[in-house]
Regions:
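Non-catalytic accessory segments flanking enzyme active sites
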Residues: 21-94, 98
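Short beta-strand element of the alpha/beta-hydrolase
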Residues: 99-107
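Short substrate-entry loop that stabilizes the transition state in hydrolases
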Residues: 109-115
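Glycine-rich "HGGG/HGxG" loop immediately N-terminal to the catalytic nucleophile
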Residues: 130, 143-156, 191
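Conserved acidic catalytic loop of the alpha/beta-hydrolase fold
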Residues: 162-178
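Gly/Ala-rich beta-loop-alpha elbow adjacent to hydrolase catalytic centers
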Residues: 182, 186
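Short glycine-enriched nucleophile-adjacent loop
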Residues: 187-196
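Conserved small/polar residues in nucleotide/adenosyl-binding loops
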Residues: 204-210
Length: 213
């Protein structure tokens, strides 16, 4: 991995949301004007109002962001500037002498949190009864404009984003060959990775494939 504190374009990253930001979110949710919302008692015209009130109360009174923040920060994270955009990504180096690089891309609306339960088994299969030779080095990026990645200067389509992710894998991280996996928009992006960057992408795995490119 070629990212460290001495490099301006790629540095270690940890999530640390200020208390003031968290409090602001809680205050806004708590103060939401529910009386202004139409209520037909069902789901025909959107989310059920009673359900949304219950969800908001859970968010205000029970949800513990710090717990989830700590769970994400267990993994090594970085931010790298690619094509002028700061790309946030998890980089979990796999076990053994030669783990296969694997980039996994989320969809919309989604984040890298989708992958929290699979990163460790993929990177360290021996901890779960598997074989160390089946390990992957897992790279889970936040797509541009999502999570802790910066927003692009204009709308970017999946093909453009695929080029950014390939640059992350080959130019920033230095991998000659890797596997691409994705679902939803991540599946479309992964398909473009395989189509446009076949010299680097050895395989693609799509959990929600597109019918045509």
């Amino acid at each position: 991995l070629r990212c460290d504190n001495s490099m301006s374009f790629c540095q270690p990253f940890k999530i640390d949301i200020p208390d003031a930001t968290l409090n602001s979110v809680i205050e806004r949710v708590a103060a939401y004007p529910w009386h202004e919302m139409p209520n037909d008692g069902g789901w025909d015209y959107g989310s059920n109002l009673d359900y949304m009130k219950e969800l908001a109360q859970y968010w205000v009174n029970e949800y513990d962001w710090r717990k989830h923040e700590s769970a994400i920060n267990i993994f090594s994270q970085f931010r790298a500037q690619v094509d002028g955009i700061d790309i946030h990504f998890i980089h979990e180096v796999g076990s053994g002498p030669s783990p296969t690089p694997l980039i996994i891309s989320h969809g919309w609306p989604g984040t890298v949190v989708e992958f929290m339960k699979v990163i460790e088994p993929l990177a360290h299969p021996e901890r779960f009864g598997g074989k160390v030779e089946d390990a992957f080095t897992v790279i889970a990026p936040s797509l541009p404009g999502f999570g802790f990645s910066g927003a692009p200067p204009r709308p970017y389509g999946p093909r453009k984003i695929a080029g950014i992710l390939n640059a992350l894998m080959t130019e920033v991280l230095g991998y000659d060959s890797y596997i691409a996996q994705g679902g939803d928009w991540g599946g479309t992006i992964s398909a473009w990775l395989g189509f446009d960057h076949s010299k680097s992408v050895s395989y693609t795995h799509l959990t929600l494939p597109t019918t045509a490119i």
